[in-house]
From Swiss-Prot:
Stored Gene3D superfamilies: Ribosomal protein L39e
Sequence similarity: Belongs to the eukaryotic ribosomal protein eL39 family.
Keyword Transmembrane helix assigned: no
Key words, A-Z: Ribonucleoprotein, Ribosomal protein
Protein name: Large ribosomal subunit protein eL39
NCBIfam families in alphabetical order: PRK01242.1
Cross-referenced InterPro entries: Ribosomal_eL39, Ribosomal_eL39_dom_sf
A GO cellular component entry from the record: ribonucleoprotein complex
Amino acid sequence: MSRNKPLAKKLRMAKANKQNRRIPIWAYAKTNRKLRYRPKPRHWRRNSLKL
């Protein structure tokens, strides 16, 4: 992908990147282990973003 991206697309890609991270340990502990995994896991090669 090109290096020069529109700002709106860049922001959407950044949000998708944040959503793909694991949940923090403190959230796991605070909810008494109810949150166990990422709600929408996405692999960079298998699933494409519909941006």
